[in-house]
């Protein structure tokens, strides 16, 4: 799997199945089950380290887990989150840190933010580092948002998000994640940009879907997010649960209306 293949999948309407991964064993299972993209997410701060958010995750953490995932992967495309504080200062800072993640096995790095990140995205892409953007709910800004809330529900915010998506694509971003935005807006973004758009809590009309591995396996304390489906129920094994997730994404039976925000 590579960026060109993912682009071709969008063009022919084949949905892209993305799942987070943090270690070699689960990466190998996901790879075998047909997951197209493995996201080494800074969500590991919550799922693996027990923090309340992603802000404490370090660059060294992301390097380590990227290396683990790469060691267990043969086919899937590997995207690694750039953690909080590792890319916001200057494009040069972002490049130096992205190089470390690429050396650890990432094939693309993901950065959160809209128009403010355009110079950095351009800088990285011009120097050979593929970049995935992330709009909507950007977890590294959780305190600014006042919690994990649906974004871009009013007309002005929706217009800004659409403009940001177009600008990121024009700056050279090769993929885009949309998190917790209304389904109609996500559909409009997917149609407006030429790059694959991956949704999480963004409805079924994105070019692909991503979930946190632990969430889709039902491993969470308290109430699960609305956009999550527990694929472990009735699956019998973790591998089968992942296979069922991939199949549901490809068949567009996940996400359903019950997982979607309007």
Swiss-Prot record:
Statement: the UniProt record of this protein carries the keyword Transferase: yes
EC number from the UniProt entry: 2.1.2.11
Record SUPFAM superfamilies: Phosphoenolpyruvate/pyruvate domain (SSF51621)
Catalytic activity: 3-methyl-2-oxobutanoate + (6R)-5,10-methylene-5,6,7,8-tetrahydrofolate + H2O = 2-dehydropantoate + (6S)-5,6,7,8-tetrahydrofolate
Keyword Signal listed: no
Pfam families xref list: Pantoate_transf (PF02548)
Enzyme class: transferase
InterPro entries referenced in this protein's UniProt entry, alphabetically: Pantoate_hydroxy_MeTrfase, Pyrv/PenolPyrv_kinase-like_dom, Pyrv_kinase-like_dom_sf
Main location: cytoplasm
UniProt GO molecular function: 3-methyl-2-oxobutanoate hydroxymethyltransferase activity; magnesium ion binding
Keywords, comma-separated and alphabetical: Cytoplasm, Magnesium, Metal-binding, Pantothenate biosynthesis, Transferase
Positions with a binding annotation for 3-methyl-2-oxobutanoate: 42-43, 81, 110
Note describing how the cofactor binds: Binds 1 Mg(2+) ion per subunit.
Cofactor(s) demanded: Mg(2+)
Pathway noted in the entry: Cofactor biosynthesis; (R)-pantothenate biosynthesis; (R)-pantoate from 3-methyl-2-oxobutanoate: step 1/2
GO biological process, alphabetically ordered: pantothenate biosynthetic process
GO CC terms of this entry: cytoplasm
Active site (catalytic residues): 179
Binding site for Mg(2+): 42, 81, 112
Matches recorded under Gene3D superfamilies: Phosphoenolpyruvate-binding domains
Quaternary context: Homodecamer; pentamer of dimers.
NCBIfam families from the UniProt entry: panB, PRK00311.1
Family from the record: Belongs to the PanB family.
Function field: Catalyzes the reversible reaction in which hydroxymethyl group from 5,10-methylenetetrahydrofolate is transferred onto alpha-ketoisovalerate to form ketopantoate.
Protein name: 3-methyl-2-oxobutanoate hydroxymethyltransferase
Organism: Methylobacillus flagellatus (strain ATCC 51484 / DSM 6875 / VKM B-1610 / KT)
